[in-house]
């Protein structure tokens, strides 16, 4: 089963990008495993994991959705080293 996870730079309780990611995750969980990871989750955001917990996969059955909203070298370096397919959602 393919896992589809989302990556955010930051995650808040009520911000628009995190809310969108939660909505997408809810739909994705109907077809398989799906979580949200962020470099900077705000305190109290318990449903988003630290990006470092996602790790790099040697499996080919994982897709990453990246919500690009601002520059963060650590996130870009993680994605650059990632062998998984990455889907970009650009937030302006």
Regions found by a protein language model. Name each.
Residues 44-92:
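Extended catalytic core of nucleotide-activated donor transferases of GT-like folds
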Residues 1-58:
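N-terminal pre-catalytic "stem/leader" segment of glycosyltransferase-like enzymes
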